[in-house]
């Protein structure tokens, strides 16, 4: 038959070209198609029939989505897929969003990414495990509650604060949950996890004790980040750095008290000698216990031209410091840092107090003088030096960030970051040990919630020793896949910077650290019996019991008697709660299924590299020596569409509810619906920062609008088609239809692979290219005549309908995980599915290996090259008003083109359909006589078959001339003998009706 299998001149099983066809739009020439107003033949033309709307305007989009959710069983889908008898399981563990405030676009980005992954895996045949959760405890909620209560908050008991915090968290959870459901997120909504749930808290306490029992949890007096504004210790993950913070940096003299032997030999004693120190935290000077140097570095004794005094500082810093102090230094001598050993200097505020000179590796030459002031209670490295050399670690600052009485009467009760700093600087001036003060703008840690600066102060806290855990964790991370790969290094670097993990907080809204403290001695009590008792109470009644039950019920005699313990009345429950990163970091133990308790995927924002990803890893490695995840995906943050941070002051905050349902002024903030939000997420490069704004959302809506048009064409043109009875066998289809199935299989394979790699952006780009270029601009424009003007049951028409059915199926399944509402809407309009189920209950894309015909690329691409030459020669004109003669020298190309047209001249051949002309003539040699008005176009085409084994370049000529035929009043092609008679094809179709 004319549309049969290509008769290619080589052995069966040949492989065609590996290059991809660059299909070009045919819009370069006018291509008129019949429409519903084709006069007396109107009723004989088979125009598309579908009730699927081209556009949903205004409220129609969000309303249609809600209708689809109801009609297609969105709420039952999760339980349906869990009940399937399938072998493979896919577990995505939901990192709990914080139960504080309204849903925002960051939530949308995160939840929609997870849902796309889950829906793909479910359609691909896996049983998806996805239990949403919320992080419910912690300082941000407590502070919010207290600030709303104002003065009333001062008189509240711990339990009153907890009750109000719980109510606040519950309200936020309900708001967020309803938004997530509205966005089409498929999840186990009936069994969410909450970190304030008693069963969750009990599991968390068991994990805590497992780590304690292994010697990983300990109580110690150490410097920690402390927030005076929140009156609690903070972990690194609870800090945010303010790059605009202004500190008062000072250069201070520490007078020499006792020189080391080497230094003694370099000075003559005629001038006073001081060690020069620079610090950005003047308030820590009163707590100084030592000055540190770098043993391997060179140091210098210099003479100051202004004062005549001798100073000691790093040799590399002499010029810089002299310039800063607006003086000149004359270098008297240089020596190695190690030569400072055993020397001491005077405390700059307490002359008779010695500060030893000590070697330390944390001293750098990047800033300052190469000599570092060391206050063990107020610096992590300082603490390390003090531990090594048994220095005092007295903390002079209380919970409110003010000096204690130990700091002396001049400083007592003064805030260290404000008036306290002023007084210290004045005291240094009085002591004549201040050389210079200047303002320094630098990055400084702030409390993530109160937005106020923190300090470092030593206090008794509970810590996890992560030194050993880190080694095992880093080894295990080598087996975890990170997307993008660079995220792994980021996580390891953050872990390396963390010396220990402070897990205690001095607040009440959280899980108590289950330890009892002796009333009079610095002793505490915790063992397996006390833990078992507390865990059972918490499991049944929640962690409120720690505050509501009397001590004798929390620590009953029978529990103590098991270990021969002391009287319970000597002990009281501790007042500290656990860090919320420990709360959420133990979620794997409560949520993950099966004995392995490992998730296939964790997917969160990049801030979780130092947060939840890390706390989950550390607790899991500590208790069971394995990572809780197999793959980790890290996405960026959301920004305004110009790449700026969103803020109320800039007026660029995008609220997802406004995106979905529209704002107050719907002309400015139209209702886009949830699918536009989902397309925006999928289309973004989520591995970097993600922009959102009106133009971005409009672009997403336009993409979906074009997709709807494509889908409407597909649905409308299969209205009279039943795949079971009307399909044409693939090998009997038109070449162009077979070719589209070949492209479709390639598309399906690529899209499936991209979903597996979680590269949803490439899925969108591939789909968009296919439905705009390959379908709308190319294939649809070619097949309209066959669809509209052939007989209803003509095999030529059924051939392209067979292709359209397969295209529709693949396209809908390809975008279903991204646009579930649109996918279901289309599924309801497919005419040959009488009782449509949900598209999500019918599996993933299915293609046939018989579609794979790479050799067809040579046939189609060669004709397209000729057609492009033809259309380019008649810009803006109707191609159907011209006839073409194609001249090809005998050989491979001629034989390939000949399979598209067996007659010499035809207006109905596959070749002419592709050329879109009035008629096409195929010749092996040029005609002898041509009229003067012809256009001659020359070209060459390289045939490449059998993976390059068969290569042949052929020349061709396309001769273009106006047709002598008239426009057929039915099909509008120029194939009729006169304008009032039908062309032969249409006459045959109409007479047969």
Swiss-Prot record:
Short motif ('HIGH' region): ranges: 97-107
Motif 'KMSKS' region positions after renumbering to this chain: 645-649
Organism whose genome encodes this protein: Macaca fascicularis
Gene: IARS2
Entry's localization field: Mitochondrion matrix
Entry-linked PROSITE patterns: AA_TRNA_LIGASE_I
Annotated positions of the N6-succinyllysine modification: 55, 175, 222, 460, 481, 756, 762
Cellular component aspect of the GO annotation: mitochondrial matrix
Protein name (Swiss-Prot/TrEMBL): Isoleucine--tRNA ligase, mitochondrial
Catalyzed reactions: tRNA(Ile) + L-isoleucine + ATP = L-isoleucyl-tRNA(Ile) + AMP + diphosphate
SUPFAM superfamilies xrefs: Anticodon-binding domain of a subclass of class I aminoacyl-tRNA synthetases, Nucleotidylyl transferase, ValRS/IleRS/LeuRS editing domain
